[in-house]
């Protein structure tokens, strides 16, 4: 793959990660005090990976909305570049669905796991499968749960252009969160994209896999889950924070 250098908005600084994990690099650099806007990235024929360092100015429970903002940013980017019939959905836990199949996911880490604390930094990571390995040897329907852009009619999308578009659209939504109506605007956009809303689901959390009906979210995008038996529970978005 011949790569052009991505061009990012002025508030973002790209960093080519080569074969290294951009999410790990972003978290390491954030811990060292790098400025917000650092965007390490890595591209191969089969995978796009990137991560964005943020410096929120609110407690962690509210700042986690950035995770959803970057998810909506990805859908907006794919929507602008992919064929019109392409369906993009976002799992609450970060998974990305393309025409119903898994094709990647979002990750999130922060300097603290205390919902009430003011985090020094938050990192949002993105992984997207561009092409399945040995896809030419796969029969149609052989991997129904897993897919890639190339398998869904999006193989002509320039991955560098997609990375640039994700950065631009995510920045729009991150800025929107700073406005008085930004959280409501993000919720309206996100609600139309979230996977299995109102349906029975299994939630793959780090320490458990609760089941129930996905009723909706609270003001901080925490999941409201109604089990078949017992009380309705709230699963905070901070539950998705990863150790790095």
Briefly describe each language-model feature range:
Residues 39-60:
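A glycine-rich, hydrophobic loop/mini-helix early in the fold
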Residues 88-100:
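Catalytic palm active-site di-aspartate
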Residues 46, 90-92, 208:
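Short, basic and Ser/Thr-rich N-terminal targeting/leader segments
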Residues 48, 96, 222-223:
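Hydrophobic residues embedded in beta-strands of well-ordered beta-sheets
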Residues 40-41, 88, 214-216:
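Short, exposed beta-strand/loop patches in secreted or surface proteins that constitute
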Residues 2-36, 56-65, 69-83, 102-244:
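Long, positively charged amphipathic alpha-helical accessory segments at protein N-termini or as interdomain linkers
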């Amino acid at each position: 793959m011949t790569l052009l250098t991505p061009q990012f908005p002025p508030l973002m600084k790209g960093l080519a990660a080569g074969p290294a994990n951009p999410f790990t690099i972003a978290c390491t650099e954030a811990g060292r005090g790098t400025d917000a806007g650092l965007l390490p990235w890595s591209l191969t024929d089969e995978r796009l990976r990137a991560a964005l360092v943020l410096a929120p100015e609110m407690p962690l429970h509210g700042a986690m909305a950035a995770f959803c903002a970057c998810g909506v940013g990805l859908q907006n980017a794919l929507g602008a570049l992919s064929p019109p019939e392409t369906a993009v959905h976002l799992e609450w836990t970060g998974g990305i669905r393309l025409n119903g199949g898994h094709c990647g996911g979002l990750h999130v880490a922060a300097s603290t796991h205390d919902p009430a604390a003011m985090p020094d930094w938050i990192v949002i990571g993105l992984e997207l499968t561009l092409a399945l390995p040995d896809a030419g040897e796969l029969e149609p329907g052989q991997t129904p749960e897993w897919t890639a852009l190339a398998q869904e009619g999006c193989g002509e999308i320039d991955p560098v252009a997609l990375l640039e578009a994700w950065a631009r659209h995510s920045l729009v939504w991150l800025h929107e969160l700073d406005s008085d109506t930004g959280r409501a605007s993000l919720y309206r956009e996100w609600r139309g994209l979230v996977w299995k809303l109102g349906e029975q689901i299994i939630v793959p959390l780090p320490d458990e896999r609760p089941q129930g009906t996905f009723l909706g979210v609270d003001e901080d995008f925490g999941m409201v889950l109604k089990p078949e038996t017992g009380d309705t529970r709230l699963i905070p978005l901070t539950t998705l924070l990863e150790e790095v």
